[in-house]
C-alpha cells in the first residue's frame, strides 16, 4: 500500500511594486531584477507536463521573501498551526518552512500581511518563482 502525503508550503511571498524601499517588518526580502529566461523543460521523461520550453520576460523587478515563509512567521497569523508542526515528520522548528497550508491559507496570509504592513503582498506567479530560482 502506498501512502500519499500532501505537503504544501508557502514557498515565498512577493511585495509589489519593487519600488517600495522599506523592508517588511516580518519577512526579509530580496529584489529580483527584470529579465528573461527559458521556462519549462523539453518535456522528456517525467517533465512532459512542463513542455514546451519557452522564453518568458519578467518586465518589472519585484521583491521576494529571502526564504520560504517559516513556521514562526506563519503562526503570527494563525497560532493554531502549531498543532501541525512535526506532523508526519515534517517541519517542526520555528525556522523551517511552513507546511500543511492550502493555497487559500497562503493567500489569506498574504492578505493579513498586506493589512498589517500597509504594503501589497501576494504569492509569486509560477513564472516569477521559476525565474527567481533559475535566473534571478
Where in this protein do the model-derived segments appear?
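Bacterial N-terminal signal peptides
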Residues: 8-17
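Boundary at the C-terminal end of the N-terminal hydrophobic targeting segment
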Residues: 20-24
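Active-site microenvironments of metalloenzymes and redox enzymes
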Residues: 36-45, 56-136
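C-terminal, low-complexity/hydrophilic appendages and adjacent surface loops
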Residues: 46-51
Amino acid at each position: 500500500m502506498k501512502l500519499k502525503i500532501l505537503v504544501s508550503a508557502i514557498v515565498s511571498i512577493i511585495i509589489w511594486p519593487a519600488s517600495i524601499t522599506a523592508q517588511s517588518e516580518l519577512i526579509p526580502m530580496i529584489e529580483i531584477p527584470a529579465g528573461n529566461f527559458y521556462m519549462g523543460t523539453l518535456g522528456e521523461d517525467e517533465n512532459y507536463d512542463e513542455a514546451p520550453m519557452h522564453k518568458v520576460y519578467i518586465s518589472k523587478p519585484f521583491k521576494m521573501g529571502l526564504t520560504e515563509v517559516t513556521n514562526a512567521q506563519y503562526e503570527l497569523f494563525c497560532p493554531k498551526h502549531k498543532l501541525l508542526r512535526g506532523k508526519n515528520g515534517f517541519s517542526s522548528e520555528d525556522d523551517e518552512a511552513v507546511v500543511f497550508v492550502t493555497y487559500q491559507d497562503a493567500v489569506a496570509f498574504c492578505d493579513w500581511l498586506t493589512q498589517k504592513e500597509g504594503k501589497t503582498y501576494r504569492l509569486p506567479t509560477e513564472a516569477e518563482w521559476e525565474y527567481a530560482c533559475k535566473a534571478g
